Amino acid sequence: VTGKHRANEERPVPRPPRRGFSVGRVHRFSESLALSNAYADAEWWIPIYRQAFPKLMTAVSIREDGWAQRGGIDRVLTLQCGRTYTVDEKVRTENWPDILLEQWSDEERRIPGWIQKPLACDFIAYDYAPTETCYLLPVAPLQRAWRQRGREWIVAYGTRRARNPGYVSVGVPVPRDVLMQAIVDAMRLATNERRSIPMQLLPSPSQASLPF
């Protein structure tokens, strides 16, 4: 689900403290949490969620470090019927034509990134701040699409590394239209379909000598 929003011009949208600093590029948790909190009050979130869920009653931001934050939950949505959904909010400060899927949070220690580790959230809200556009990605089909197509995407689109003190994280930039179609395909289930091999078994791009 995608949504386009426009912030109220009378109240500026909160911006991160450092320009060019994107959610997901630096994976030290305290810094990522601080940046997430900088955007938590942005005026676009509620209109986006009301587009996706017209019967939305509340949208509670989760800011404290705890199991919910570390499980990928930034906001809890409650509908009139009592149904709740949990969302991981990611913001990119540049309008790149792709969605960057974090394969490894720490490449050397083989700590999986959010695309292949278990997440507690139902959706990932992937927002491009400059164009005021958000993609609401259902986590289960998204991760199944990765299991089905991840190898293909690594070869086709390469990887992007973020070098941080003591560790390197790795992401795969998948074009938005390609990822959207893969999610749709992942929603089709067949009992005779061959089971996908978990992406955790993949060698790192450097070990596999893949083009970057």
Where are these regions (language model features)?
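Acidic-basic catalytic patches of nuclease active cores, encompassing PD-(D/E)XK
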Residues: G3-K4, N8-R11, P17-Q69, T93, ...
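Catalytic cores of nucleic-acid endonucleases
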Residues: R28-L33, K90-C134
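Non-catalytic C-terminal interaction segments of nucleic acid-processing enzymes
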Residues: R19-L33, T78-C81, P130-F212
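Conserved catalytic cores of phosphodiester-cleaving nucleases, focusing on short active-site segments
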Residues: R75-L77, C81-N95
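Intrinsically disordered, low-complexity regions of eukaryotic proteins
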Residues: R11-P12, V76, K90, W104, ...
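Assembly/interface hotspot detector across virion components, adhesins/toxins, and nucleic-acid enzymes
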Residues: L56-M57, A125, A156-R161
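Short beta-strand or tight-loop elements
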Residues: G71-I73, A120
